[in-house]
UniProtKB/Swiss-Prot annotation:
Oligomeric form and interacting partners: Heterodimer of HisH and HisF.
Entry protein name: Imidazole glycerol phosphate synthase subunit HisH
InterPro entries reported in the protein's UniProt record: Class_I_gatase-like (IPR029062), GATASE (IPR017926), Imidazole-glycPsynth_HisH (IPR010139)
Pathways per UniProt: Amino-acid biosynthesis; L-histidine biosynthesis; L-histidine from 5-phospho-alpha-D-ribose 1-diphosphate: step 5/9
Organism lineage string: Bacteria, Pseudomonadati, Pseudomonadota, Alphaproteobacteria, Rhodospirillales
CDD domains found in the cross-reference section: GATase1_IGP_Synthase
Organism, scientific name: Azospirillum brasilense
Gene: hisH
Catalyzed reaction equations: 5-[(5-phospho-1-deoxy-D-ribulos-1-ylimino)methylamino]-1-(5-phospho-beta-D-ribosyl)imidazole-4-carboxamide + L-glutamine = D-erythro-1-(imidazol-4-yl)glycerol 3-phosphate + 5-amino-1-(5-phospho-beta-D-ribosyl)imidazole-4-carboxamide + L-glutamate + H(+); L-glutamine + H2O = L-glutamate + NH4(+)
Amino acid sequence: METVALIDYGSGNLRSPAKALERAAAGCHASFQVLVTSDADAVRKADRVVLPAVGAFADCKRGLSEVPGMQLMAEGGREYGVTEGLGWIKGEVVKLEPADPTLKIPHMGWNELDIRREHPVLAGLRERAHAYFVHSYRFAVERPEDVIASADYGGPFAAVVGRDNLVGTQFHPEKSQETGLALVANFLTWRV
């Protein structure tokens, strides 16, 4: 049985992402133990690691020196001041500023994914799949080839980024119903 470590960095409720991982594993008939942990040794030993999308860039980075999700893969961010990221994917996290001033921030709701390139975690997603977003900042990715899918909210933004064995989503897979569960199942069965 493989282990998926869901990192608990003390910044939010992890029940929803843990349940999504369990449902996706059952749906793809994969044998995974979901371990919610803040123990660095357990994370190192895990077969897969998930950084849930709860909390803010600066709070989580400063509080634990662990990464809360896609945005911390960036070189830096500007949420709650300038914060250094991990630099795994070139780019910066900046305020979401839609061209249409009537659009509200934070962006909360369903958006269509525009798949830019093939990737195993998006395999089998239906064309124009929708995902659920809640965010006020976006990852301004420097290299277009690192954007796997985008969405639009008064202008395009990176919805899924990835390189090598790393993938991050701006949306909440655990709240994105069929699309999210398919992505999580693909992640669990993905072989690099």
